[in-house]
Design a protein with these regions (language model features):
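Metal-dependent nuclease catalytic regions and adjoining charged, substrate-binding loops involved
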Residues: 22, 110, 139, 169, ...
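Short connector loops/turns at beta-strand edges and beta->alpha or beta->beta junctions
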Residues: 35, 155, 195-196
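Short, solvent-exposed loop/turn segments at secondary-structure junctions
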Residues: 44, 162-164, 195-198
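Glycine-rich loops and low-complexity Gly/Arg-rich segments
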Residues: 55, 64-65, 150, 181-184, ...
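Non-catalytic protein-protein interaction segments used by genome-maintenance enzymes to assemble
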Residues: 132-179, 183
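Metal-dependent nuclease catalytic cores that hydrolyze phosphodiester bonds in DNA/RNA
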Residues: 1-146, 255-256, 260, 264-277
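Solvent-exposed, well-ordered amphipathic alpha-helical segments
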Residues: 119-128, 150-157, 181-191, 203-210
Length: 277
């Protein structure tokens, strides 16, 4: 990293998660919700994964096992359901709803990717990591990310399980795709959206234009971090408890709001000598 002093200063804070690099998730969170960005990367506290996020993780792993021939679809579904229940052992409300989506989403994902070939992973089974340097004028910073599925046919697919299939990719997903496409220009990057009833491949957004927007965001992020410490940001920027990021996150709300309280110095006991008569 070069000439981005704000990001560098946050990366050196004790307990900070602000590594001296950027990713699609870091950029998108900065664009979407500054207080949660402060909480995650500055204060170093994150929320527990909601049922929909856990559903997405177990489905992605299940689809990989089927495409690699390690499991049948039925076996993959059983394993995915077991993993989900390990996290949400008491299926209630949203967790029960997400549990019921696992089978149809695995089946449709495998159907969508059946002709793509066997995906390529690292020897230890982990996803392929991308890393390159983003530069503009006098500054530069590493960009990192992980690819869901890399196929021998020259395609990279990022799997998105959702209850509603979009007609156009969201800006946050376009930013993510642009980062991946820039890292692997010899491949075609697609996003596969899978609902319980259908699937669709999308690849929206002009990559050069999006990369210019990403550079602007990185510079804004650095300026923000230069002007405020995480504590100063928490004292200045209120959270919206009704937003997607903060809803039901009562522990994180408390931790964030505690940053506004003045730090009390520990009192040290001093011994006094009494004058003897």
């Amino acid at each position: 990293m070069k000439n981005l002093p704000g990001i560098r200063s946050w990366s050196k804070i004790h307990n900070s998660q602000m590594n001296p690099n950027v990713s699609a998730s870091k950029i998108n969170l900065f664009n979407a919700d500054i207080p949660m960005f402060v909480m995650n990367y500055g204060i170093g506290k994150r929320s527990e994964s909601p049922p929909a996020a856990v559903r997405g993780i177990v489905i992605e792993d299940a689809v990989a096992s089927v495409l690699q021939g390690r499991r049948s679809i039925d076996e993959a579904v059983i394993k995915a359901c077991e993993r989900f229940v390990q996290v949400f052992y008491a299926l209630q409300n949203d967790s029960h709803k997400q549990y019921n989506l696992i089978r149809p989403m695995i089946e449709l994902s495998c159907e969508a990717l059946k002709d793509y070939g066997i995906p390529i992973f690292n020897p230890d089974g982990t996803q392929e990591k991308i890393e390159y340097t983003l530069k503009q004028d006098t500054w530069e910073i590493p960009v990192v990310g992980y690819l869901d599925f890399v196929f021998p046919n020259g395609k990279i697919v990022d799997l998105k399980t959702t209850t509603r299939c979009p007609s156009v990719m969201s800006l946050s997903h376009q930013i993510q795709r642009a980062i991946y496409q820039t890292a692997r220009p010899d491949h075609e990057v697609e996003f596969l959206y899978v609902t319980p009833k259908k699937f669709q491949f999308l690849s929206d957004g002009d990559v050069p234009t999006l990369m210019d927007e990403i550079k602007t965001t990185v510079k804004r992020m650095d300026t923000f971090c230069s002007l405020m410490s995480p504590e100063q940001a928490a004292m200045s920027i209120p959270i919206n408890p009704e937003s997607f990021y903060w809803r039901d996150q009562y522990t994180l709300q408390r931790i964030y709001n505690e940053q506004t309280k003045p730090k009390t110095k520990r009192k040290t006991k001093t011994k006094t000598l009494e004058k003897m008569e």
